[in-house]
Amino acid sequence: MNSYSLLTRSFHESSKPLFNLASTLLKASKRTQLRNELIKQGPKRPTSAYFLYLQDHRSQFVKENPTLRPAEISKIAGEKWQNLEADIKEKYISERKKLYSEYQKAKKEFDEKLPPKKPAGPFIKYANEVRSQVFAQHPDKSQLDLMKIIGDKWQSLDQSIKDKYIQEYKKAIQEYNARYPLN
């Protein structure tokens, strides 16, 4: 039995708003999980130049030193990498640069196909708008203290201004849900 059925069975009919909240939370969680799963399937960052070298020469190092543990073989490989001639090392570095540029291109294409993140909530939108102003007024404060100041400003903000941010968020989230429905 899934968590949604447990939630719906455990409350009475008078708790309809709670059902909607539970449903919304589960959908948001599912949407985030789906996005994270898609991201995991994306292109992987290429390995370093040293690991390219290690892949090419590991079997040779194992043949030369069959009794050594893998950590000791890696240590030998690291020492040989450090003492490697510049032109040979450059071959691996340029190969890594080539792989990295291919990765960046594939990553950009992949990221364009991902659904965007959910719109920021009302407080986050407000915080983003006033952050630079608050930081300029209090340059000696830590990030945590500055965020507390922004939180206090939000709490003391006139409700009509808060409602403006809330309405903008509701509109943005409706557009987001319409454009990227959760099946």
Curated annotation (Swiss-Prot):
Record localization: Mitochondrion; Nucleus
CDD domains: HMG-box_ABF2-like_rpt1, HMG-box_ABF2_IXR1-like_rpt2
GO cellular component, one term: nucleus
Signal peptide: none
Positions of the DNA-binding region: 43-111, 116-183
Transit peptide: 1-26
The keyword Nucleus is assigned to this record: yes
Major localisation: mitochondrion
Database matches in InterPro entries: ChromReg_NeuronalGeneExpr, HMG_box_dom, HMG_box_dom_sf
UniProt-recorded Gene Ontology molecular function terms: DNA binding; DNA binding, bending
A single GO BP: mitochondrial genome maintenance
Repeat keyword on record: yes
Record key words, sorted: DNA-binding, Mitochondrion, Nucleus, Repeat, Transit peptide
Gene disruption: observed consequences: Has a temperature-sensitive growth defect in glucose-rich medium, with slower growth and smaller colonies at 37 degrees Celsius but not 30 degrees Celsius; the phenotype is suppressed by overexpression of YHM2.
Note in the entry: Present with 3810 molecules/cell in log phase SD medium.
Function, in words: Specific binding to the autonomously replicating sequence 1 (ARS1). Interaction with regulatory regions: probably involved in compacting the mitochondrial genome. It might play a positive role in gene expression and replication.
PANTHER family registered for this protein in UniProt: HIGH MOBILITY GROUP PROTEIN 2
Protein name, UniProt field: ARS-binding factor 2, mitochondrial
Originating species: Saccharomyces cerevisiae (strain ATCC 204508 / S288c)
